[in-house]
Amino acid sequence: RFCGSVDAIRALNEGRCTVAGFHAPMQPAASSLVASTYRPLLATGQHKLIGFAVRQQGLMVAPGNPLGLAAWSDLLRPQLRFVNRTLGTGTRLLLDDWLAQQGLDGRAIAGYAHEESSHAAVAARVASGQADAALGIESAARAHQLDFVPLMHEHYWLVCLKSALDTPAVRQLLAVLSAAGWNAELGQLPGYASEALGGQVHSLKRTLPWW
């Protein structure tokens, strides 16, 4: 089932799934909104991380990037029509974290209140001409014949309860993620790269520098 990163971890904690996926910047500050949002949801000794992928987040724009967008700050242009992700998604969290770092809130971005639930949905809005830009991943942009302006790299982690590590399903998942064939498949997705520690199990404190 698809849902955003924050909602996915909540689903895991409520017993509605066995494994959840979430993404976070490579080096978020311990005081960042990203860290303060994820930290209460993950408990040392209870949750374990599984290496999955490294990917890029950036701006999805019309072919040729007619507005010349190149940086986060370009989202503050008064005439820019932006389409946002819904609250509870990791991509929305990235945007809100950037705004907080600038001392701004969503009112600074025209279209901040216009929301869609997935990368594909915001890409479709840009492709249809209803929006000038959206924050998202390159694979969704390319699937809709859009250009992509990379802004940052991030880790995409899987997380499960420690008690689930010995279940057949999770053991099989770890085996797949550790296989060379999986890494080759992942590398075919635009904007994705295999995680050096893919398929390996990690503790929160040793792996997340902002913990």
Where are these regions (language model features)?
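Flexible hinge/capping segments at coil-to-helix
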Residues: 52, 61-82
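N-terminal hydrophobic or amphipathic helices and topogenic motifs
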Residues: 1-16, 41-47, 70-73, 100, ...
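Short loop->beta-strand "edge-of-pocket" segments that line small-molecule binding or catalytic clefts
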Residues: 73-93, 97
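Short beta-strand-to-loop elements that line the ligand-binding cleft
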Residues: 1-3, 106-119
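Periplasmic-binding protein-like
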Residues: 43-56, 146-175, 196-202
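A ligand-binding cleft/hinge motif common to bilobed small-molecule-binding domains
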Residues: 21-38, 123-152
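Short helices/loops that flank or line small-molecule/ion binding pockets
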Residues: 6-20, 25, 115-130
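Short helix-loop capping/hinge motifs at secondary-structure junctions, enriched
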Residues: 64-70, 104, 163-169
